[in-house]
């Protein structure tokens, strides 16, 4: 080439870096956000808009954040930011859960239990200081994720005002009649020395002893008569039970049978040379006898369970204790014997049976529950068969009790069972049911259960199965144990009568008075309070209780202590947490909301799955498969983590591995490269001067704006239904297919070769400006750092941050009367695909090197040919090929053929044209390039 025409081309130019370099670039953006008080500015721009309130469920203030925290906070952040673009004011007030056992354990490890080196006041202060330190660490990590919120004024459950509002919330619940006191079996952790909530329990496999124990009948003939059988004089009669908790047998006070189950009187194994008949559920008889070494099922009679009611048995090792046969609807024929040993101090269903029969007051507290808070039998526990139980831990007692049963001849079978068993979420140790005096929010009193079930149906659940799940949980849950026997928490400020144990009749009003003091001085004031201040002359008749509130009550009343306190409306628009929160925060918030206001505190509930590795295994240190968010940020950047979260179906388990992160990085690169190409071609474009009206745009440019409009509608709808994976896929497809494989490829010719201010070039730049202005908004909720950076390179005057705007309004659909309609483009793009398929084998066989070397002939039916012939001169730009000819033919649809060109190649645009050499000044250029270099410039209408 004798002349260098490169300087006549308008190649892309931008300072927007090709490499994201996110680990270095993101902290600088964060610094600017901090310096500019970005959250305050965001709220100021949104002032006066409709409110969208996503209420933050508080993470626990203990330990560094993990991947699950990152998933949760980033999903919330994506929603908050998308709502701002959607025209809402979407405040975000982060919070922390600060009371409870994990912090107590951390302080105990350092200083010992309360009373060792610290008194209770000092201990609570150390807990408070520890929680504050943990909040600082977690806040730093959350902000590094790009989470925008009121980080300078978060809510903390340890704040005096919050603690006071929590007591006021409890007072409301007392006013509504939902609080009761009772001695009931509750989940108990010996290591905690306290009751546990349902949400503080996790199920882990455990090996337990499995025993069948015979309870002899005191009047065997009468019991046999129930089965229309006559008991021979030398035959014993017993009812076997099956249990995996032999340690509860000292508390066994009855046997429950199913009233409608069928029972049979069968021949059992001999005992001391004597025959023994057994009563078993018919459906379980053969299986039970097999455990006892009996192969033959010999039935002496049958009866319904109801017929055995109130017959009396003997305790297997306490001869002076009589055991009544009671009816229990919880008894099933699924396993065991069909008879359930009933210890009302160690089982909720057992307790309910005794309550129904009015038997609870017939026994002392030690008889109902002979086990202390540490898991040791009380000194009053009776011994048997040389076995002294008093002072023995129940787990050590299990094998000793089995041996003693064997010696007494009442052990029918013994084995071990590997099964799922409840454990303390913090200590990872087995827990038990243990009857203790506790305070409960009653599910039945004041009809809380039915009101909660109704409220659930007025909430929108994402995914939809969440509704059925929480309905089932509420239908079956027991009363909520809200009292804890610990130190670090909000006290239950009740005065109870010294003799009757009844709460003071003015309890709610007294609570509010205590709350006023707590707001000024903190929870310690309750313990130092002189009760004569509040009770006057009644003070001697009452005593303060020292229990604290369940931490799930703390977080469960945030709708009251945070939203109302900050002037925000209830119910919140959205609660968003992990799937385990159906039994945690969603449920505690629901119950307090219904108890106080007779309504759920949220309109929508969204749950996300847990993070697992590529094999579906839970991430853990022991497996060595954990990936920490801090490591991802350090090596790849927060936007890569955000993109992975957004692109994953969070309704199920969320898989992450290094390979998945690599694919996510590739996807990010595609998005960034697309943005960079768009910006590069906007070099020298000023929208205030050069923007082409939509009606004057080249047809292809107008069509891509139409496509962007369609995609924006799809993206907005997906953000509304929280389907972020669809958004990411839509954007990636747009980058690859609509832009990369089509629009950007086709328009390079116009952008590079036309005169700088040519209408055809300005039309393409206008389209790219519209695309970029929309594109940056589409990605902003997800790729917040990259969108911030991209926004700073967008030409023209605009707001300081993309999130100060709303969805881009410069897009519009093609009008029905457009010269080329959307339907026309669908057909043309189908034609383009056919052309590509025809050229592929020619390129593969070396017939042509590039599509520009091929001349295309399209034979089409008359109507199609007539429609396409006006486009003939420009179809070559759409196909990026040589000349195109359209001819009518007697055919349905169209037929594409191609042949190599014989024309010369233009040194500037690389097209093969017949007029090369016709211009003496530019003999190496085609006529189009000559007019673009030295003339008025070419005219383009379609492509």
Curated annotation (Swiss-Prot):
Sites where the protein binds ATP: 621
Entry coiled-coil feature ranges: none
PANTHER family linked to this entry: ISOLEUCINE--TRNA LIGASE, MITOCHONDRIAL, SOLEUCYL-TRNA SYNTHETASE
Reactions it catalyzes: tRNA(Ile) + L-isoleucine + ATP = L-isoleucyl-tRNA(Ile) + AMP + diphosphate
Annotated positions binding L-isoleucyl-5'-AMP: 577
NCBIfam families reported in the protein's UniProt record: ileS
PROSITE patterns per UniProt: AA_TRNA_LIGASE_I (PS00178)
Binding positions for Zn(2+) per the UniProt entry: 906, 909, 926, 929
Short motif 'HIGH' region, span: 59-69
Taxonomic source organism: Xylella fastidiosa (strain 9a5c)
Broad class of where this protein is predominantly found: cytoplasm
A GO cellular-component term linked to this record: cytosol
Name used for this protein in its record: Isoleucine--tRNA ligase
Pfam families reported for this sequence: Anticodon_1, tRNA-synt_1, zf-FPG_IleRS
């Amino acid at each position: 080439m004798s002349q260098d025409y490169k300087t006549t081309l308008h190649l892309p130019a931008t300072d927007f870096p090709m490499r994201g370099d996110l680990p270095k670039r993101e902290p600088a953006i964060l610094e600017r956000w901090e310096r500019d008080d970005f959250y305050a500015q965001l709220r100021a721009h949104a002032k006066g808009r409709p409110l969208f309130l996503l209420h933050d469920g508080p993470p626990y203030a203990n330990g560094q954040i993990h991947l699950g925290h990152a998933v949760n906070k980033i999903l919330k952040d994506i929603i908050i930011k998308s709502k701002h673009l959607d025209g809402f004011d979407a405040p975000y007030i982060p919070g922390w859960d600060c009371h409870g056992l994990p912090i107590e354990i951390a302080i105990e490890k350092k200083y010992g239990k309360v009373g060792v080196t610290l008194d209770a006041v000092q201990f609570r202060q150390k807990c408070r200081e520890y929680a504050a330190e943990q909040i600082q660490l977690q806040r730093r990590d959350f902000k590094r994720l790009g989470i925008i919120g009121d980080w300078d004024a978060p809510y903390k459950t340890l704040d005096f005002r919050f603690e006071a509002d929590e007591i006021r919330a409890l007072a409301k619940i007392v006013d509504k009649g939902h609080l009761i006191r009772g001695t009931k079996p509750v989940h108990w952790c010996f290591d905690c020395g306290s009751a546990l909530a349902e949400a503080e329990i996790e199920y882990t496999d455990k090996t337990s002893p499995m025993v069948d124990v015979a309870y002899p009948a005191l009047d065997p003939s009468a019991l046999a008569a129930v089965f229309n059988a006559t008991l021979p004089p030398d035959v014993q009669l017993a009812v076997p039970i099956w249990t995996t908790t032999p340690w509860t047998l000292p508390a066994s006070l009855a046997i429950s049978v199913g009233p409608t189950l069928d029972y049979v009187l069968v021949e059992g194994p001999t005992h001391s040379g004597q025959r023994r008949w057994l009563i078993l559920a018919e459906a379980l008889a053969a299986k039970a006898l097999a455990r006892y070494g009996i192969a033959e099922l010999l039935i002496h009679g049958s009866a319904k369970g109801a017929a055995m009611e109130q017959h009396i048995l003997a305790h297997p090792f306490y001869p002076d204790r009589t055991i009544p046969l009671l009816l229990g609807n919880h008894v099933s024929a699924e396993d065991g014997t069909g008879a359930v040993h009933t210890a009302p101090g160690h089982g909720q269903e057992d307790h309910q049976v005794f309550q129904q029969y009015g038997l609870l007051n017939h026994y002392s507290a030690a008889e109902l529950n002979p086990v202390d808070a540490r898991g040791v039998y009380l000194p009053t526990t009776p011994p048997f068969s040389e076995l002294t139980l008093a002072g023995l831990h129940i787990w050590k007692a299990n094998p000793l009790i089995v041996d003693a049963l064997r010696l007494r001849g009442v052990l029918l079978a013994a084995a071990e069972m590997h099964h799922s068993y409840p454990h303390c979420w913090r200590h990872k140790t087995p827990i038990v049911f243990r009857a203790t005096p506790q305070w409960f929010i009653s599910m039945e009193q004041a009809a809380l259960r039915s009101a909660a079930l109704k409220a659930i149906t007025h909430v929108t659940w994402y995914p939809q199965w969440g509704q059925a799940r929480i309905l089932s949980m509420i239908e079956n849950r027991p009363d909520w144990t809200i009292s804890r026997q610990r130190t670090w928490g909000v006290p239950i400020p009740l005065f109870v009568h010294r003799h009757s144990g009844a709460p003071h009749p003015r309890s709610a009003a007294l609570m509010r008075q205590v709350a006023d003091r707590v707001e000024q001085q903190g929870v310690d004031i309750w313990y130092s309070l002189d009760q004569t201040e509040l009770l006057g002359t009644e003070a001697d008749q009452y005593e303060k209780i020292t229990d604290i509130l369940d931490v799930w009550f703390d977080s469960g009343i945030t709708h009251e202590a945070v939203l109302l306190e900050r002037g925000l409306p209830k119910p919140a628009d959205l609660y968003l947490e992990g799937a385990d929160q159906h039994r945690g925060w969603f449920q505690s918030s629901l119950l307090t909301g219904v108890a106080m206001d007779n309504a759920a505190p949220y309109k929508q509930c969204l749950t996300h799955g847990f993070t697992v590795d590529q094999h579906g295994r839970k991430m853990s240190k022991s497996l060595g498969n954990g990936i920490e968010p801090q490591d991802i940020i350090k090596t790849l950047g927060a936007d890569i983590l955000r993109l992975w979260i957004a692109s994953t179906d969070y309704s199920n388990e969320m898989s992450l591995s290094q390979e998945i992160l690599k694919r996510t990085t590739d996807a990010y690169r595609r998005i960034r490269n697309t943005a960079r190409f768009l910006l590069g071609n906007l070099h020298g474009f000023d929208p205030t001067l050069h923007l082409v009206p939509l009606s004057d745009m080249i047809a292809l440019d107008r069509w891509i704006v139409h496509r962007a409009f369609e995609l924006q509608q799809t993206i907005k709808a997906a953000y509304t239904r929280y389907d972020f994976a669809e958004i990411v896929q839509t954007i990636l497809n747009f980058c690859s297919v609509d832009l990369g494989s089509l629009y950007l490829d086709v328009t390079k010719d116009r952008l590079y070769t036309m005169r700088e201010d040519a209408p055809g070039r300005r039309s393409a730049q206008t389209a790219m400006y519209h695309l970029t202005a929309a594109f940056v908004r589409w990605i902003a909720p997800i790729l917040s750092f990259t969108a911030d950076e991209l926004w700073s390179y967008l030409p023209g005057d605009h707001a300081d941050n993309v999130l100060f705007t709303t969805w881009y309004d410069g897009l519009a659909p093609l009008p029905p009367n457009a010269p080329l309609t959307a339907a026309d483009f669908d057909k043309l793009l189908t034609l383009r695909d056919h052309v590509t398929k025809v050229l592929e084998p020619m390129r593969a066989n070396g017939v042509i090197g590039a599509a520009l070397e091929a001349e295309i002939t399209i034979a089409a039916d008359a109507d199609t040919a007539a429609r396409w012939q006006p486009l003939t001169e420009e179809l070559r730009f759409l196909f990026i090929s040589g000349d195109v000819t359209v001819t009518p033919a007697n055919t349905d649809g169209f037929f594409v053929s191609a042949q190599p060109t014989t024309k010369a190649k233009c040194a500037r645009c690389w097209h093969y044209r017949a007029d090369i050499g016709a211009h003496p000044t530019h003999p190496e250029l085609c006529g189009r390039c000559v007019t673009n270099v030295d003339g008025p410039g070419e005219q383009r209408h379609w492509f």
